[in-house]
Every structure is written in C-alpha cells, then in structure tokens.
Amino acid sequence: MVVNIERLFSKRANRLRSSEIRELLKLTQMPGMISFAGGLPNPKAFPVEIIHKCIDDTFKKNSETALQYGTTEGVAKLRRVLAERMRKTRDIDCELHDLIITSGAQQALSLAALIFIDPGDTYLTSVPAYLGAVQAFHAYEANCESIPMDEEGIDTDSLR
C-alpha cells in the first residue's frame, strides 16, 4: 500500500520549494569542479591538528557528557563566556539569557523569521541578496521588496 504523506503536510510545508543553495552545492561534488562560491572554505585551511587536540582534550576531561544533548539555547558555559566578552570588549550589557547559540547563519535567520515575520509582512533586501535569507523569509510568507545598490551600498534614493 502506497501512502501519500504529502497530503498531511501543512500549507507552509507545501509552499516550500527546493533550496537553490542545496542544488548549487550538489554541483561542487562533481569530480574536478572548482567552486568559487561562498561558504565553501578551502579544506587545506582547516586547523585539523588543533581540532584533533581539542577533541582529545574534551574526551579526556568530559568523556561522560561530551556527546550528550545540550540545551536548545546553547551550552551555558559558552554563553556565559560570550556574555562576559561582550561586556568587556564591546561595553555591551549582555547577560546569559540574551544569547542563543545557533549552528550557523541559516539557523539564526530561520529563527529570526519565526520570531519577527507574520504572513504578508514585507521585508527589504539589497540586490544581490543572500539567497538563504530570502528563502528563510519566504517560508514564513513574507513579501520581498528589492532595493538596488550603487557603489556606496544600498541606493537610499530608491526608497523615496
């Protein structure tokens, strides 16, 4: 028996389309392909030895908890250190509850869209724009208004 699970999807999920970024990244897997796209650092630049040392140290000191799930907002110790750094180096009054650790910019953009965008809201973006942000905002049914750029950045005259 074949079950059509897509009929159970939410309206929002049915509006989603395949990620253009994901499709482009598939091309980077082709043999001999040299990608000049952003977001794919040169693997030779990775500090592999330092990462190995950090992993070894972590397992020596915290072997029972190193692979456990953490809190949704991120490890409290890391958030405390970052809050203190914000206070000391940037004079920003920052507390533990003011910070959330994400796995990257895309997760942060998706969370921001979830919190701030209602269906039908309009957001402004430069042209060109980060495709991942446009897709995250589109998923929450926002309307995009593009603003042209000139040699100094966003063309503010076009906002009038």
Where are these regions (language model features)?
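PLP-dependent aminotransferase-like
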Residues: I117-R160
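Conserved beta-loop-alpha segment that forms the PLP phosphate-binding cup at the N-terminus of a helix
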Residues: A76, L96-Y123
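Amphipathic coiled-coil/heptad-repeat helices and related helical stalk/stem segments
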Residues: R17-I21, A105, L109, Y130, ...
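N-terminal small-domain helix-loop-helix segment of the aminotransferase-like
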Residues: N14-G104
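Alpha-helical elements of the RecA-like P-loop NTPase motor core of helicases
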Residues: R80, S110, L131-Q135
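Generic N-terminal amphipathic, Lys/Arg-enriched alpha-helix
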Residues: V2-R12
